[in-house]
Design a protein with these regions (language model features):
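A short SAM/SAH-binding and catalytic strip from SAM-dependent methyltransferases
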Residues: 127-141
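A short acidic, Gly/Pro-enriched loop at the edge of an enzyme's catalytic core
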Residues: 119-129
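A short glycine-rich, Lys/Arg-flanked "PGG" loop and its adjoining helix->strand segment in the class I
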Residues: 75-79, 142-157
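Conserved alpha-helix/loop element of class I SAM-dependent methyltransferases that forms part
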Residues: 40-58
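Conserved SAM-binding motif I beta-strand of class I
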Residues: 83-88
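Core SAM-dependent methyltransferase catalytic element
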Residues: 189, 195-216, 224, 243
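Conserved class I S-adenosyl-L-methionine
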Residues: 57-66, 159-184
Length: 243
């Protein structure tokens, strides 16, 4: 009579894989956790980059860069005359980003270990700030993005991509922000909603620009928005709480 394989033996391949991750370094394990195994299928990174209309020579911040999923795609888009600031508050991830930039020869990528309340971008500013799957992690988002305005150059933009209620796993663990919350918070931080792209199945993809108002003036609610097809709409205004 053949003995049945133990549960331990059945699990050995998984344990070996876990051990490999551990031996390869904590940052690599985090990177795999952030990016998943099939992210390209649902994140559509090439279409995201194309939608942002980045020009050679642009300066771009990848806010919450993580393992560099978008960082080096952005670096290719801005070219040698441009610059990408890979911003993260996790030292493990910034060290990983620095190693990757060196290995890839990406001289147009600067890595920034930021503070939780300030991305610490250069005073010279950027043309675009892209934040992907990071918005829901930021505390005091209105004050955070109000502070970030100083880093945007004239005609600068912020692109926010975050999980929404359609993402089942992320919704279960509240790793998401409803679209209407993002719009309301960004308006309160001093931005107008410029455009929306709807080709991402799990995420909202929203573009904002700073409102131009006189010093000391109160920012008006309900700034004009435009969807991907160019049709105007207005953000919903409602009372809410978000943990």
């Amino acid at each position: 009579m053949k003995s049945q394989p133990s549960k331990f033996h059945a699990c050995r391949p998984k344990l070996a894989l876990l051990a490999l991750f551990i031996l390869s370094g904590c940052a690599t394990l985090k990177q795999c956790a952030y990016e998943g195994l099939s992210r390209d299928e649902w994140q559509k990174p090439d279409r995201v980059i194309q939608s942002l209309q980045i020009r050679p020579g642009n300066y771009v911040a990848d806010l919450g860069a993580g393992g560099g999923y978008f960082t080096f795609r952005l670096a290719a888009a801005v070219g040698s005359a441009g610059k990408v600031y890979a911003v993260d508050i996790d030292p493990d991830m910034t060290q990983l980003l620095e190693r990757q930039a060196k290995q890839k020869g990406a001289g147009n990528v600067d890595v920034i270990l930021a503070k939780p309340d300030d991305p610490l971008l250069p005073a010279s500013g950027v043309d675009l700030i892209l934040t992907v799957n990071t918005y829901h992690h930021i505390s005091s988002r209105v004050s955070y993005f109000a502070n970030v305005r100083k880093y945007l150059r004239p005609n600068g933009r912020i692109a926010v991509i975050d999980f929404d209620r359609r993402a089942w796993i992320e919704g279960l663990f509240r790793h998401y922000t409803p679209r209407e919350f993002i719009i309301r918070e960004m308006e309160n931080a001093g931005y107008s909603f410029q455009r929306e792209f709807d080709f991402l199945d799990r995420q909202s993809f929203l573009i904002f620009a700073p409102l131009k108002v006189a010093a000391g003036a109160r920012l008006p609610p309900g700034a004009l928005q435009r969807r991907e097809d160019g049709s105007p709409t207005r953000a919903p205004h409602r009372s809410y709480e978000m943990s």
